[in-house]
Amino acid sequence: MFMTSKKMAAAVLAITVAMSLSACSNWSKRDRNTAIGAGAGALGGAVLTDGSTLGTLGGAAVGGVIGHQVGK
């Protein structure tokens, strides 16, 4: 049974995200909210702009700012 390249990339991404988030256990709540907002914004920007790099970066920036301001 062979994995397609998309499935392999998705698995590697999931493992990388899980390991990255486990390294953030000592972050403050605001830092975590900023990182989560940036990730969600990047995903939203990529979806809305059909994978455009500029859209992804813009979404990450806006999401990070929103995540930082939540719960202030």
UniProtKB/Swiss-Prot annotation:
Residues 1-23 form the signal peptide. The keyword NAD does not apply. Keywords: Cell membrane, Lipoprotein, Membrane, Palmitate, Signal. It comes from the Bacteria. A lipid is attached at C24 (S-diacylglycerol cysteine). It is found in: Cell membrane. Transmembrane segments: none annotated. One of its GO terms (cellular component) is plasma membrane. The gene is osmB. A lipid is attached at C24 (N-palmitoyl cysteine). Disulfide bonds: none annotated. It is a lipid-anchor. Provides resistance to osmotic stress. May be important for stationary-phase survival. Pfam families: Rick_17kDa_Anti. Induction: By elevated osmotic pressure in the growth medium. This is Osmotically-inducible lipoprotein B.
